[in-house]
Amino acid sequence: MAFANLRKVLISDSLDPCCREILQDGGLQVVEKQNLSKEELIAELQDCEGLIVRSATKVTSDVINAAKKLQVVGRAGTGVDNVDLEAATRKGILVMNTPNGNSLSAAELTCGMILCLARQIPQATASMKDGKWERKKFMGTELNGKVLGILGLGRIGREVATRMQSFGMKTIGYDPIIAPEVSASFGVQQLPLEEIWPLCDFITVHTPLLPSTTGLLNDSTFALCKKGVRVVNCARGGIVDEGALLRALQSGQCAGAALDVFTEEPPRDRALVDHEKVISCPHLGASTREAQSRCGEEIAIQFVDMVKGRSLAGVVNAQALTSAFSPHTKPWIGLAEALGALMQAWAGSPKGTIQVVTQGTSLKNSGTCLSPAVIVGLLKEASHRADVNLVNAKLLEKEAGLHVTTSHNPAAPEEQGGAECFLTVALAGAPYQAVGLVQGTAPMLHALNGAVFRPEVPLRRGLPLLLFRAQPSNPTMLPTMIGLLAEARVQLLSYQTSVVSDGETWHVMAISSLLPSLEPWKQHVTEAFQFHF
């Protein structure tokens, strides 16, 4: 999937000037317009392939479906709550964020919240401003020796851990993705959640808001916590059940909470914000000059690198696409799409299970990025959808009646020659199997149903191929075929045959354009099909 035709980018929220400068230096046109209504945003996007936002702009399904040229949405920040990911994915629009841009700012705010909870600094400040001097009321607690539970050990979680360890806190945590030995390297002992709750004096959450993390702290988990636990949420509103938190504060099970985020922002229900044991901020996690500059810089660099074909970073809705920018993987992506298009033409818009098999050590982990490319080849012509691409391929797979499986064989079979790696695409339970390989950077067709081409057949994007199977002993067959091409005013560009398999030979003709019909060919051959990708 190429983004070389991305020319113009709209920046619809306030960003550091460096964002615009980097985009322009990378050869992109930039339009900056803020505070746009939905209708104004749609109007501006009619001439833009890219959109960069912070959190103010709402990229809804209406906006996405109306923006005919839009290819990429970049979120200068971590959360993508303001982008309709499902609508973007279905439309084949790539969504990117800058997961590291505001990590330090969010981590520092979290640490500040922990300190404020321990010493009741905001409450004491408010008391002083009221003209009071209440030393006894604001008795605090030391952090030294206390246990901090960190739920989510990504970049922010680990930055919080290393900083709070400087205060003498013992850090424990949980993350289903980070390996225990990795978290141990930055001083966090991983434990199951049920073991974490009763050990913690402080708990801070740093996970995305997912179905599995919504209400992670709830009535049941608060009941398992140490009495007097203090809770910090600078991640996403909803990870801490706000009703359960209020009940825990009222009962004394929770001694205090620091909240930078809420389920509804700004919160209409003020019960938590107004509670004397709650410290709150209006979602300030990324609100530092440094974070804003860093996020603007990072998203601009990501756009330029993507357009130049250098790399793809921060992908939210098509992680497998990241591998497509690897110099090793790029030609295999092209091969996978070509074999998918070949299979679609050969098997006649197949349904059922498509088997994608990688062979050879260097393709060991490539199945997840090659299978979407196979789907693109299968669906683009059959569905007549120009927007079928690596972003939405997996989403459209099931709707098309397909089930694509991937598997890997470490070594390529000896009978397939000296090549180290092969890609096989087959229709399960039917006689359709195509094998390809890459020579240098060129995708090549190696075999059809075991009939090997020597040399292999080049698969060039945009070049139509006519393939047919026939008896090898008919001397009049080739002149007849050339005559049929001439009648259709189609030029023969090249011609290759396979070795004999099951008494027949596969023939491949590169032609100047697709034939209007294959009916005249059917009386001369066993089967025939044509395709391009």
Swiss-Prot record:
Residues bearing PTM N6-acetyllysine: K58
Residue positions, PTM Phosphothreonine: T78
InterPro entries to which the protein is assigned, alphabetical: ASB_dom_sf (IPR029009), D-isomer_2_OHA_DH_cat_dom (IPR006139), D-isomer_DH_CS (IPR029753), D-isomer_DH_CS1 (IPR029752), D-isomer_DH_NAD-bd (IPR006140), NAD(P)-bd_dom_sf (IPR036291), PGDH (IPR006236), PGDH_ASB_dom (IPR045626)
Swiss-Prot/TrEMBL catalytic activity: (2R)-3-phosphoglycerate + NAD(+) = 3-phosphooxypyruvate + NADH + H(+); (R)-2-hydroxyglutarate + NAD(+) = 2-oxoglutarate + NADH + H(+); (S)-malate + NAD(+) = oxaloacetate + NADH + H(+)
Gene3D superfamilies assigned to the protein according to its UniProt record, in alphabetical order: D-3-phosphoglycerate dehydrogenase, domain 3, NAD(P)-binding Rossmann-like Domain
Binding annotation for NAD(+): T78, R155, I156, D175, T207, C234, A235, R236, D260, H283, L284, G285, A286
Active site positions: R236, E265, H283
An individual GO BP term: L-serine biosynthetic process
Keywords recorded for this protein, A-Z: Acetylation, Amino-acid biosynthesis, NAD, Oxidoreductase, Phosphoprotein, Serine biosynthesis
Assembly information from the UniProt record: Homotetramer.
Record's function text: Catalyzes the reversible oxidation of 3-phospho-D-glycerate to 3-phosphonooxypyruvate, the first step of the phosphorylated L-serine biosynthesis pathway. Also catalyzes the reversible oxidation of 2-hydroxyglutarate to 2-oxoglutarate and the reversible oxidation of (S)-malate to oxaloacetate.
Protein name according to UniProt: D-3-phosphoglycerate dehydrogenase
Organism expressing this protein natively: Sus scrofa (Pig)
Gene: PHGDH
